[in-house]
């Protein structure tokens, strides 16, 4: 980076305020445009990391047709349940919910999260009544953590946009999937580029050196035991502290999006990917799983939403050939 004359901080102000997320489930605020009628995202649970070798199928790479080492993240992908459909219109203030339809029946675990109707009825005709006003249709889905090794039964509920150009086709697809279970193979394929949206690991209350990367002061400051503080918090005038001054505070547990992660494999037999002794702080994988190249934000057990790539790269290379996936113990023995 080189030497800078003034370096008040290393961190970016673009991420301010650096406060805790409201809940450990991410909220997706923007969606890509797709012509295919299908869900544009899928929630999974992060299990852990390992490493793998794959044959590079990018012809532009200097390692083309060679075995390449890479760290990979393993995420368990149990089937999701389509609990309802919500239709949105548009006014001068933006999107506005027009109507919603709930399924005929629900999993009993969903009652741990919301109040279920006593006599559910999927009245899908409500979608046809406002079809001329609909600009976007989203599926109300919930996860099924009871099918995994997680010590929880309460599901997470999120909205996922249904892609497509023709509203009538989107409504027909929504009517078809309501009340059903979908697998990750209904949404993604191997070799595809995706975005990962999740809440990062929480670090708690930290000082300005760790939080903003300010310089540690030596000499008389360190002798007085104040070497890790902000040297100046502002001028005499204006007589207030600017919000840009690097201060101690919350680190981690923020919602972050990482773009263009590559799916190396989507598997059905989780036992083939579990290392000896299981994944640390997670255990074994019992359902479908996704192998993503590189790291993914968040600790083990946290829900990660895989979204269709919103900055979709022009070059697509298809599914690479995996030659080796490590299943050695991650417990250090």
Swiss-Prot record:
GO MF annotation list: rRNA binding; structural constituent of ribosome
Gene Ontology BP, a term: translation
Pfam families assigned: Ribosomal_L3
InterPro entries named in the record: L3_arc_euk, Ribosomal_L3_dom_3_arc_sf, Ribosomal_uL3, Ribosomal_uL3_arc, Ribosomal_uL3_CS, Transl_B-barrel_sf
An example Gene Ontology CC term for this record: cytosolic large ribosomal subunit
Keyword annotations from UniProtKB, A to Z: Ribonucleoprotein, Ribosomal protein, RNA-binding, rRNA-binding
Biased composition (Basic residues): 1-10, 17-26
Region Disordered, residue ranges: 1-29
Gene3D superfamilies: 3.30.1430.10, Ribosomal protein L3, domain 3, Translation factors
PROSITE patterns, sorted: RIBOSOMAL_L3
Function according to Swiss-Prot or TrEMBL: One of the primary rRNA binding proteins, it binds directly near the 3'-end of the 23S rRNA, where it nucleates assembly of the 50S subunit.
Subunit and partners: Part of the 50S ribosomal subunit. Forms a cluster with proteins L14 and L24e.
Family under the similarity heading: Belongs to the universal ribosomal protein uL3 family.
Protein name: Large ribosomal subunit protein uL3
Organism: Methanococcus aeolicus (strain ATCC BAA-1280 / DSM 17508 / OCM 812 / Nankai-3)
Gene: rpl3
């Amino acid at each position: 980076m080189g030497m800078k004359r003034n370096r008040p901080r290393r961190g970016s102000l673009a991420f301010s305020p650096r406060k805790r997320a409201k809940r450990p489930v991410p909220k997706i605020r923007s969606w890509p445009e797709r012509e295919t009628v299908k869900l544009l995202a899928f929630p999974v649970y992060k299990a852990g990391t390992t490493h793998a070798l794959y044959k590079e199928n990018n012809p532009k790479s200097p390692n083309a047709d060679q075995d390449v080492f890479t760290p990979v993240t393993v995420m368990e992908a149990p089937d999701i349940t389509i609990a309802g459909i919500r239709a949105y219109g548009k006014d001068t203030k933006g999107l506005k919910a027009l109507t919603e339809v709930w399924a005929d029946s629900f999993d009993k675990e969903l009652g741990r999260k919301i109040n279920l109707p006593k006599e559910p009825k999927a009245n899908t005709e409500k979608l046809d009544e406002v079809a001329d006003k609909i600009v976007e249709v989203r599926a109300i889905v919930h996860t099924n953590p009871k099918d995994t090794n997680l010590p929880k039964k309460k599901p997470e509920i999120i909205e996922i946009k249904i892609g497509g150009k023709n509203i009538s086709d989107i409504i027909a697809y929504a009517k078809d999937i309501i009340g059903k279970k979908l697998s990750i193979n209904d949404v993604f394929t191997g070799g595809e580029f995706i975005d990962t949206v999740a809440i990062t690991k929480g670090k708690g209350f930290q000082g300005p050196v760790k939080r903003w990367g300010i310089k540690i002061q030596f000499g008389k400051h360190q002798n007085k035991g104040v070497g890790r503080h902000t040297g100046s918090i502002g001028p005499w005038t204006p007589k207030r502290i600017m919000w840009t001054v690097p201060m101690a505070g919350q680190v981690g547990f923020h919602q972050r999006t990482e773009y263009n992660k590559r799916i190396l494999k989507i598997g059905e037999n989780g036992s083939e990917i579990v290392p000896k002794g299981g994944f640390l702080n997670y255990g074994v994988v019992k359902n479908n799983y996704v192998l993503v190249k590189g790291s993914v934000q968040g600790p083990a057990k946290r829900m990660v939403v895989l979204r269709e790539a919103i900055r979709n790269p022009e070059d697509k290379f298809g599914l690479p050939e995996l030659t080796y996936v490590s299943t050695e113990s991650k417990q250090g023995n």
